Design a protein with these regions (language model features):
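Long, low-complexity or tandemly repetitive, helically biased scaffold regions used
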Residues: 1-181
Length: 181
């Protein structure tokens, strides 16, 4: 009788099954690793870059340079928070699937979407990139080569992670819909 009750609750989504549980856990781990990679990569760049070094590389407007660096710092803060949340979730036993799904949802909106549509409009998403094989982001002004070398590979990684999270949402989890029709 007890097994039938548990099976009914599992079917209603009140108790996660082992397969779904492991999918959420793996996605949380992959997302945390991705965010840590982003933080390390961007921090390495920011630790070696100054406003003067960017302008020496390519004479561009000081305000735009400041906005780009500010956007990178903001992105790093969000990604660091997301990586920390994923790490804490993975250490907890039992694994809290509902909290993990909410964390993945927040990562999507605070990190992934912020990368493609930064608050300060320092660059924008090239929506045709997936069809043309080009860069996923376009700058509003010419930028130094070092900045392109940082962001263009990151854009491919962000595209992949966005697809992973959208695929995860579409694979039957109870996570809130990521993309609104």
């Amino acid at each position: 009788m007890k097994e039938a009750k548990c099976e009914r609750q599992r079917h209603e989504g009140k108790i996660p099954n082992e397969m779904g549980h492991s999918i959420v856990r793996v996605q949380t781990q992959q997302t945390g690793e991705f965010l840590s990679m982003v933080v390390n990569t961007v921090n390495d760049y920011l630790n070696q870059t100054t406003l003067e070094s960017l302008q020496a590389e390519l004479p561009i407007e000081k305000g735009y340079c400041c906005d780009v660096l500010s956007t990178l710092r903001r992105m790093t803060v969000f990604c660091e928070g997301g990586a920390d949340a994923c790490r804490r979730l993975l250490m907890q036993e039992p694994f809290q699937e509902a909290r993990a799904e909410k964390t993945l949802y927040n990562v999507y909106h605070q990190c992934i979407e912020e990368f493609f549509m930064p608050k300060k409009d320092t660059w924008c998403e090239n929506s045709r990139a997936s069809y043309t094989g080009g860069s996923a982001i376009e700058f509003y002004h010419a930028v130094p080569a070092s900045l392109e070398q940082l962001l263009l590979p990151l854009s491919a990684a962000f595209l992949k992670m966005r697809e992973e999270l959208a695929h995860y949402e579409a694979s039957g989890s109870s996570m809130a819909p990521i993309r609104q029709p």
